[in-house]
Design a protein with these regions (language model features):
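P-loop NTP-binding core
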Residues: 1-199
């Protein structure tokens, strides 16, 4: 994980990169131990053991490896800890998946309000990511609330909402059971061509 970099024990992030079976796609895995940054990062900063402000450590890590990649995707937990603040400060574009469901929509509203309040106290060094909303769990079934929720979300966030949506499907979960991605599923393992395409 990036924990040793976050704690000032490594100078670059290349040690954490792991190849995958797909050419050109590498990952840096994470685990629960990475949550140590929530309790230890500020202490390391106070001791003078970090090369940058605590909220800029992920940006610094990415800068050490960015020359090897065209695109870097970061997945973050939906909380407001120092890890998420690092993601916000490291991202050029921040895509926030928001299910087309009422409770998820209200949670996203609260998340953005809290994030805005929190970032008022953080020096972003003149950088602010482009924030976009991605509608997920979208259903076209009769009686679905998704079309109505899409209208509410687009009214609230306007051009921040991406045009495309992620449709609700069981194909991803079925692939996980078989330890395969949706791209690796055999044709006879798919519910239907349409459901597979939605995945």
């Amino acid at each position: 994980t990036l924990l040793p970099f976050y704690l000032g024990e490594k100078d670059d992030a290349s040690y954490a990169i792991k190849p995958t079976c797909w050419p050109g796609l590498d990952i840096i895995p994470s685990c629960l131990a990475l949550h140590r940054i929530e309790t230890e990062l500020m202490g390391k900063f106070d001791e003078g053991k970090l090369p940058a402000d605590p909220h800029l450590m992920l940006r610094l890590a990415i800068e050490t490896i960015a020359h090897d990649y065209d695109v870097i995707v970061i997945d973050s937990a939906p909380n407001l800890g120092i890890g998420t603040i690092n993601v916000v400060c490291a991202a050029d574009v921040l895509i926030v998946p928001t299910p087309a469901e009422l409770f998820d929509y209200t949670s996203a509203l609260q998340f953005f309000d809290m994030l805005r309040d929190l970032l008022k106290n953080v020096d972003l060094k003149g950088f602010e990511p482009d924030v976009r909303i991605l509608l997920t769990k979208y259903s076209n079934n009769n009686g679905s609330q998704s079309p109505w929720m899409e209208e509410q979300i687009r009214d609230a966030w306007g051009s921040m909402v991406l045009k495309n949506v992620v449709r609700e499907t069981d194909e991803v979960g079925k692939g996980q059971i078989r330890m395969r991605t949706v791209f690796e599923q055999a044709i006879d393992q798919r519910s239907s061509t349409g459901a597979w395409r939605n995945a």
